[in-house]
UniProtKB/Swiss-Prot annotation:
Superkingdom as given in the UniProt entry: Bacteria
Organism: Chelativorans sp. (strain BNC1)
Lineage of producing organism: Bacteria, Pseudomonadati, Pseudomonadota, Alphaproteobacteria, Hyphomicrobiales
GO cellular component terms, semicolon-separated: cytosolic large ribosomal subunit
Stretches that traverse the bilayer: none
Family from the record: Belongs to the universal ribosomal protein uL6 family.
Stated role: This protein binds to the 23S rRNA, and is important in its secondary structure. It is located near the subunit interface in the base of the L7/L12 stalk, and near the tRNA binding site of the peptidyltransferase center.
GO biological process per UniProt: cytoplasmic translation
Protein name (Swiss-Prot/TrEMBL): Large ribosomal subunit protein uL6
Quaternary structure annotation from Swiss-Prot or TrEMBL: Part of the 50S ribosomal subunit.
Ribosomal protein listed as a keyword: yes
Length: 177
């Protein structure tokens, strides 16, 4: 039994939600998002909340139940408040800057790395060692942050590279003589 799936998702103030068959649409101040729910899950909009139930008691239906509820909650939060991921850059000479819409990264390569964000994603650089990725779709925001981090992930000896804000890097001891 899914403990997450049992709770209906309340529709926040300022957000209009619509359920059309298996498609949940949310429209809010930040934009509009759609989510197609798996066929094993039944979705209903009743008195200001979206209820999610499994169609049958199969293992597949129960496994999709809680995930579908969380995805719906994420699109409702996204169109109201949006999501953001913060990245930090550590290392001598490692820095980030915006060049038009593109993110320019100096990460110790022989060339600068240029990253063009997908539509709906905003990248800002408050400091040369800090990157903020924001948007309304939680999955896309996390994917963009992961792609930027992948260019130069943090290494365990000195901690140089791109890491998520608040991420702790397990440090290793160097060679001993």
């Amino acid at each position: 039994m899914s403990r997450i799936g049992k709770k209906p998702v309340p529709v926040p103030q300022g957000v209009t939600a619509n359920v059309d068959g298996q498609v949940v649409t949310a429209k809010g101040p930040k934009g509009e998002l759609k989510f197609v729910v798996n066929d094993d899950v039944l979705v209903k909009l009743e008195d200001g909340a979206i209820a999610v139930d499994p169609r049958n008691e199969s293992k597949m239906a129960r496994s999709k139940w809680g995930m579908s509820r969380t995805q719906i909650a994420n699109i409702l939060t996204g169109v109201k408040d949006g999501f953001e991921k913060r990245l930090e850059i550590n290392g001598v000479g490692y820095r980030a800057a915006m060049q038009g819409k593109n993110l320019q990264l100096s990460l110790g390569f022989s060339h600068d790395v240029s990253y063009e964000p997908p539509t709906g994603i905003t990248i800002t650089v408050p400091k040369p060692t800090e990157i903020v990725v924001s948007g309304i779709d939680k999955q896309v925001v996390g994917q963009v942050a992961a792609e930027i981090r992948k260019y130069r992930g943090p290494e365990p000896y000195k901690g140089k590279g791109v890491k998520y804000a608040g991420e702790t890097i397990v440090r290793k001891e160097g060679k001993k003589k």
